[in-house]
């Protein structure tokens, strides 16, 4: 039969067409994944888009495509791909958390709250959901609710340091200094060498008017990170309030010099995208390496 088909050009069977389509899909998808891992994001997106035209049901392919879109800065498209995955796997918490993460990068805090609501319906014990919810509330200017969400998360996991750090920062912003001090002190007792913790502690002390303590703590920040522009800039204010004009001038000069030498950090969405590129597939949704 195969000889006759070759001689007379017989049409391929449905099974043969399906097998060829599967082979084409696997090849294009593999090319896309390889390009993604080589950080050739535009090329990866083209291959993966083509692969989905051959098999729109492949959720793993959509996950890789969402990563490519994130790296390209096309967050709307990335979110759309994750949304399709979530529609197919409505009980997939990891995908919902990734959607919340992308919504955070887009600064779409309404979308974040919607996704977090869905996640809490699935698992009210997941502390990361409360953390994302708090970020969304902070973005919406609802500090009390953000603090409430973080308190819930910390109550469920006492060593959730990121949540306590964020809560301390929000409390500081709200001038709730005694409460912020509790978080800063707790964090300092548990992770004393952390730059962000030291910076929070110094800022709380500065806000409380404990200038001598704040000066020392800013010094510890600099020991951990000698290039912390914020630490130099803020310590200059502390030193000036202590009457140390010379020290304040030195800190101001150091901050100015570092600011001129180091490229200005990206802000907002651009910075969030950059951070995301450094942690592709953080939740290991499909566990592919």
Which role does the model predict for each range below?
Residues 1-17, 247-289:
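Terminal, low-structured helical/coil segments at or just beyond the last alpha-helical repeat
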């Amino acid at each position: 039969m195969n000889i006759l088909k070759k001689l007379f050009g017989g049409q391929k069977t449905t099974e043969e067409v399906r097998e060829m389509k599967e082979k084409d899909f696997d090849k294009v998808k593999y090319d896309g994944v390889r390009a993604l891992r080589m950080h050739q994001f535009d090329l990866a997106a083209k291959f993966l888009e083509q692969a989905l035209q051959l098999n729109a049901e492949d959720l793993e392919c959509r996950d890789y495509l969402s990563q490519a879109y994130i790296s390209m800065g096309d967050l709307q498209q990335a979110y759309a791909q994750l949304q399709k995955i979530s529609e197919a796997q409505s009980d997939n918490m990891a995908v919902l958390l990734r959607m919340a993460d992308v919504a955070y990068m887009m600064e779409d805090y309404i979308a974040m709250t919607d996704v977090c609501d869905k996640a809490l319906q699935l698992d009210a014990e997941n502390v990361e959901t409360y953390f994302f919810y708090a970020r969304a509330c902070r973005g919406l200017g609802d500090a009390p609710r953000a603090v409430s969400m973080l308190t819930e998360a910390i109550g469920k996991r006492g060593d959730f340091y990121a949540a306590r750090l964020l809560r301390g920062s929000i409390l500081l912003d709200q001038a709730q200094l005694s409460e912020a001090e509790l978080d800063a002190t707790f964090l300092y007792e548990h992770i004393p060498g952390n730059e962000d913790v030291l910076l929070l502690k110094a800022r709380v002390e500065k806000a409380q008017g404990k200038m001598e303590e704040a000066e020392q703590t800013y010094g510890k920040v600099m020991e951990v990170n000698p290039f912390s522009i914020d630490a130099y800039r803020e310590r200059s204010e502390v030193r000036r309030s202590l009457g140390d004009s010379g020290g304040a001038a030195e800190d101001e000069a150091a901050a100015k010099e570092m600011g001129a030498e180091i490229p200005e950090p990206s802000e907002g969405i651009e910075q969030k995208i950059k951070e995301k590129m450094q942690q592709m597939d953080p939740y290991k949704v499909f566990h592919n390496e």
